[in-house]
Design a protein with these regions (language model features):
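Short, well-ordered alpha-helical segments enriched in acidic and aromatic residues
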Residues: 17-30
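Conserved short acidic donor-positioning loop in nucleotide-sugar-dependent glycosyltransferases
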Residues: 15-18, 37
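Hydrophobic residues in alpha-helical segments
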Residues: 14-15, 50
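Amphipathic alpha-helical repeat scaffolds
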Residues: 8-13
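Generic helix N-cap/helix-start motif at coil->alpha-helix transitions
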Residues: 2-4
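A beta-strand edge to alpha-helix "cap/lid" segment located at domain peripheries
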Residues: 34, 40, 44-108
Length: 108
């Protein structure tokens, strides 16, 4: 089982360094990322925006987690955008995340 805090720290390290290897080891080959609008990205598209820069995440809070899923929140700091908070629901199998869904809310 991969804990929420572990994968979120790896995700931020990827955003900071633009090096996807920090995060890639936690994601399955058939990984899907679903954004707030319901748009789905595969592993390659997720890699593209992760290594593009201009985005950081912090203030990780785990709600529940177990060997099958995590639910957590984190803040987002993105160049040119107001501060925002994200709710994450993610599913994992054998320590690799297969699905990651976010709901993002911006400060007014």
């Amino acid at each position: 089982m991969t804990q929420a805090n572990t994968v979120l720290k790896a995700w931020d390290k990827t955003l900071e360094t633009k090096d996807f290897t920090h995060l890639e080891k936690y994601l399955s080959r058939d990984f899907q990322f679903e954004d707030t609008t319901g748009e789905l990205d595969n592993l390659e598209n997720t890699k593209s925006w992760c290594v593009a820069g201009g985005l950081r995440i912090n203030n990780f809070k785990t709600i529940p987690e177990n060997e099958n899923y995590i639910v957590a929140t984190h803040d987002v700091i993105q160049e040119g955008s107001p501060k925002s908070n994200v709710l994450v629901y993610a599913e994992q199998t054998n320590g690799k995340f297969t699905y990651w869904k976010i709901q993002r809310a911006f400060e007014a």
